[in-house]
Structure formats: C-alpha cells, structure tokens
A protein has these predicted regions:
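Conserved post-catalytic alpha-helical subdomain immediately downstream of the catalytic base
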Residues: 221-226, 242-246, 250-311
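Short beta-strand/turn micro-motifs composed of small residues
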Residues: 9, 63-66, 168, 231
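Conserved N-terminal subdomain of the carbohydrate kinase-like
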Residues: 4-5, 13-138, 303-312
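Short glycine/proline- and charge-enriched loop/turn segments
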Residues: 23-33, 185, 198-201, 246-250
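Active-site metal-binding loops of divalent metal-dependent hydrolases
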Residues: 10-11, 141, 264
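Conserved phosphate/ATP/ADP-binding segment of small-molecule kinases
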Residues: 143-245
Length: 312
C-alpha cells in the first residue's frame, strides 16, 4: 500500500451525556436523568477517519469544520489522534449529536447546529491528497461536502484508478461513477430503492431476497463496482457485477451499542481495499470488524484513544 488513506465528508461532534435515571419527572411521565459525566468524540467523517488512524494507517480528512466550539473540539481531538486535516472553507457550525443515556441505555438524542452554511473553494491540498491516496472513503452525512461539484469531479477522476468507497446518506449525494464499493445500511438501501420506484423490502422483518434485489438495483443505478447492504447482526448482503448476491454472515450475533458500527464497517472495508484485498474479502473483514466493535460495547469499548472524557 502506498499513499495515505483519505476520508472525504461531513464532520460532526458526537457527545454522550451519561447519568442515572431512577425517577420520573413530577409534571410529566418522563425520566429524570442525573448527569454523572460526558464523553465526546469526532463524529461522521471524523469518526471514520479516527477508526482508520487507530487501525495504524496514515489518514487525511478532507472536510468542512465550523468555527463554533464543537468544531474546535472536533479539530483538537482529530489532531490529537493523528488525523491530518485539510479543511474546506466553511462559514457554518459543526453540528452536534448529543445522546442522553441512563447507563448504557439511550433515552434521547438532541441535535444542535443543523443549519448548513456556505462552502468555499476546494483547496489545492485537498485535490492533491485525493489524487495521491491509496484509497478514498467518502463518509456522507448529508451536510453538502459530497455534493460540491469540485469534490465530485476529483472523486470521479480518482475512482478510475484508486479504490473509492462510498458510505451514503439519505439526504446526501449519490456515489460517483466507478466507485468500487457503496455500503448503505438496510433502511438506507430501502429508501434509495424506493426513490427509484421500487418497493422491494418486506420491512420490518428482514427479507434477504428483497435486500439482495435492492443491492443489485443500487449497483446498477449508481454504476458502482459493488454494493454491500449492512444488516446489523445478520451481516451484509454483497452484490457484485455478474455475480449472485451473497450474504456475508456476522461471526457473532451480540446486542450492544451499535452507534458508529456503520462507520466501523466502512473504515474496515477501506482498510482492506487499500491493502489490495478483493471486494468480497474486504467486506468479510468489515463485517467481522463491525461485529467485534458491537460485541465489545461499541464506542465505550475503544478506550481513551477515541473517547475523550470530561467528568461533570
């Protein structure tokens, strides 16, 4: 493998407020959370970049970071982890996803700073990083970076000779022509397929045949090399050109904190493709990595390299 791995996409700040809920509010039937501490980390493309950095790769993140406190915090954490940053000029805020949790159990999610600002010109350093990468992971969180015409032109050109992996979002852009792998989750695949006039999935019950049909449809519509639809504890459904879709089973089936599991899958698949694995081998490794991540309690199991704690 030569060259850095580049992550392109939307940066967020994720925060967990953790406490104890042992009573109800007197004026409404809702729990009262007694705050014990907070944990924060880069989210979105920042989390994917952090995973790759913790996997031992040299990583550059190309994205927009706001000038608010959340942006400053995310920037500092990424730099501490060793992720290189090439920032796209941006006059908006970095959004926050805040989970309120009683122990390990989420009670509520609060989103802040969701308004999208304006982007400036794509820096030359960003173009150079993408063109020189051993692989590019596009981490789309629907904030607009992947819809920038300048970004899409470079990615389409890079995809001709370099693995481009696309982790899509329902409010985001479609993958560029020639991306080697797109990896929507099950609900995203159903939504994307419905947008094409198809209603293939018998939700909420998992229907493997319908998921396979969605994967085939999206691979054809997006004109990408392969589509892997992630299915949580059931693994992933992989559709490649001229091959019957196959289920890549998860090695373990544990229920845990799945927050970040999709980013873990995308990062692990990118790692495999950057190292020259076949798409199928990379997806097998990605399913195993995501499964292990959930089995070891997700973000809480990673340790201080990722989760920066601030007790209150």
């Amino acid at each position: 493998m030569t060259g850095e791995v580049v992550v392109v996409g939307d940066l967020l700040l994720d925060r967990d407020i953790i406490g104890v809920a042992d009573r109800l509010c007197p004026d409404a039937p809702v729990p009262v959370l007694t705050e014990m501490g907070t944990t924060q980390r880069p989210g979105g493309a920042g989390l994917a970049a952090t995973f790759l950095c913790l996997d031992g790769l040299d990583v550059v993140l190309v994205g927009a970071i706001g000038t608010n406190e959340a942006g400053d915090t995310a920037r500092a954490m990424l730099e501490h982890t060793g992720v290189g940053l090439v920032e796209i000029p941006y006059d908006g805020d970095t959004p926050e996803k805040i989970r309120l949790k009683a122990g390990r159990h989420p009670l509520l999610r609060l989103d802040r700073g969701v308004a999208v600002g304006r982007f400036g010109d794509l820096p030359v350093d960003a173009v150079d990083a993408m063109r020189g990468a051993s692989a590019v992971l596009v981490s789309d969180y629907g904030r607009g970076v992947t819809a920038m015409p300048s970004v899409r032109r470079v990615l389409a050109d890079v995809a001709r000779h370099t693995p481009v992996i696309w982790d899509p979002h329902p409010q985001g852009a479609t993958p560029v022509l020639g991306a080697i792998l797109a990896c929507p989750n099950r609900s995203e695949a159903a939504a994307f397929s419905a947008a094409q006039g198809a209603d293939l999935n018998g939700r909420p019950v998992l229907n493997p045949a319908a998921v396979a049909a969605e994967a085939r449809l999206l691979r054809s519509v997006w004109r990408v090399g392969a589509v892997a639809v992630t299915m949580g504890p059931e693994g992933a459904m992989l559709a490649e050109a001229d091959l019957v879709p196959v289920t890549i089973a998860a090695p373990v089936n544990h229920q845990g904190d799945t927050c970040g599991a999709g980013d873990r899958f995308a990062a692990a698949a990118t790692l495999g493709l950057a190292r020259g694995r076949t798409v199928r081998a990379a997806v097998v490794e990605a399913v195993a990595a995501a499964s292990h991540y959930v089995e070891t309690n997700g973000l809480a199991g990673i340790g201080s390299e990722l989760a920066m704690e601030a007790t209150t």
